Structures are given as C-alpha cells and as structure tokens.
Amino acid sequence: MLGKGVVDYTREGSILSAEQRRFYEKNGYLLIRNCVPQYELNRFRQRFQDICEKKVKAPENMTVMKDISIAKSEFKDGEKAITKIQDFADDPVLFEYCKYPGVVDVVKDLIGNPKSNLMAMHTMLINKPPDNGKLTSRHPMHQDLQYFPFRPADFICCAWTAMEKITRANGCLVVVPGTHKGVLLPHEYPKWEGGVNKAYHGIQDYDTSTPRIHVEMEPGDTVFFHPILIHGSGANRTEGFRKAISCHYANDDLCRYVNVEGTTQETLAEEIIEIAKKRLTRYGLDPNTVTLDFADIWRVRAREVNGRRSNL
C-alpha cells in the first residue's frame, strides 16, 4: 500500500474523505473540482503575460521555453511565443500557487499529514500552443519519476491545475489508472516525424492501444497524481492556447536524493546536466571547469513550501 506506516488511506484526512484517499491509493490520481478560485488564476495568467512581454523581470533561474514548431513560426514575441515556463519558484506571484492552502492541504493528505514539511521541487506554467499539423504540442506517455533523483516515490505528488477549460480538443491530460503501482520504465525520445521538444521523453515501446482516461477539466479544477503514474497529453487541435499551472511536491521529512547512475534515468540526467552547464555562462562561469551531479540541479530548484528545509 502507498505510504505504508505514514499515510492511512482507509481513513479520512484533514481535507479528503476516506473514499477520495482510497481512490488515489488505487488509481494513482485524484481530481478535485474548483480547487483554485478564478481570481487566483487571473493573477497567475496576468503574471505569465507580464513575464512573456518582459514587463517584469523573470528570475534568473527560470526557464522560458518555445515549442519547436513555434520557434519557426510567426509567433516571435509575447505570450504566443512561449509554450512553457519552468522553475518559477523564485517569482513571488507564481509561487503563491505552490503555497495555496487548497492545494497544499490536499497534497499533505496524500503524501503526509498536516505537520509534514513540503518542498516544491518542480514548477511549470504550460501554455500549450495550437498544433500546426506536426503534432509537436502533444506530450508522449511518460512517468514523471524519470526526471527526479529523489525517493520514495510514494511521497512525491504533482498538483496540476487547469487555468481554463481543458478538453480532448485542446489536449487534456490522459492517465492510465493503477500504473503507479508498477515500476519506472525505460524512457527515450519518441521517433515522431514532426520532431519532439527538448526533454519530452516517453516510455520505450509504449503500447498506444492501452486504455486511458481523458481528464477534462474546468478552470480551477486540479488533478493530483503519483510520479509513477503513466500519463501524457494530446495535441492542441484548437486555435487557442491551453494553460495549466503545476507543482511537484515532495515530503521533505521522508524523501532523500539518490544516485541515478547505472539506472534507466542516467541518460536523461546527463542531458539535463549538460543543459545546466550551458546556463552557467550567464554567470560568467566556464562550464568545463564545473562539476555537477543530477541532485545538485534539484537542490537549486527546490523551495520550502512550509516548515524548515532539511533533506532536499
């Protein structure tokens, strides 16, 4: 059972009912309707626009990404040119999402208790662009643990909030219930004709006929899911952009960094380390003289949500 000895999924939590906790334990995800109010979403949307239009200075460690199709399209500047921002934990407005009580209290019920110290490990605001026919806006089926050098997986949880109506048409999340009880599978870049965005790894030889659930959402709805749950998202076949905001949390009382050398994560870790080294030039450092390991990168990213940082 998930969280054995720490979380009792047969009992109600501070926020969640026993039925909701059992659903998460069985399926690896839980959808909470109206979790984040519209006025908060409006603030996050405005902040994203201000960052894209350079009306406010983005934190130095924030990553601003373009879809490979956008990089070659008519969208050169502003909100329509950006497909995602990552590592927004040092932005005072966007980080309020990670600390929003309606989200944090659910996470604590799933991977800890009311006194648990949580860390925000990975943050994203996704602006999925309209697909130009090459299907580059889709995300291959994957497991988030592929990217994380910390364990145990049962004490990591993603909160993913819709900032607008999200449907199959504009590329909602798809999940394969129960797969969180399996293991981390080997990942690689999909061999897609239209190309694949940087670090968009997918499960090797994945059977696309496997039944899946499409998680359609209204603004403010939030899906919480386990890092081994197999999931992905479809292409955005509408003319508009599709926004969502997310944070991966880890229970800092229980999680520790692990060495991924010699595992299925090693290749991706090397790729991310190389990306990080290239960014060191921003600070006047020679990347060839700096030694980094995968855990170092995550230590820099991680931020306290509550309590005092201890292990991560």
From Swiss-Prot:
Catalytic activity: phytanoyl-CoA + 2-oxoglutarate + O2 = 2-hydroxyphytanoyl-CoA + succinate + CO2
Any one GO BP annotation for this protein: fatty acid alpha-oxidation
Coiled-coil features, chain-numbered ranges: none
Pathway(s) per entry: Lipid metabolism; fatty acid metabolism
Family per similarity comment: Belongs to the PhyH family.
Cofactor: Fe cation; L-ascorbate
EC number in record: 1.14.11.18
Source organism, top-level taxon: Eukaryota
Keywords: Dioxygenase, Iron, Metal-binding, Oxidoreductase, Vitamin C
Protein name: Probable phytanoyl-CoA dioxygenase
Binding site for Fe cation: 142, 144, 231
Function recorded in the entry: Converts phytanoyl-CoA to 2-hydroxyphytanoyl-CoA.
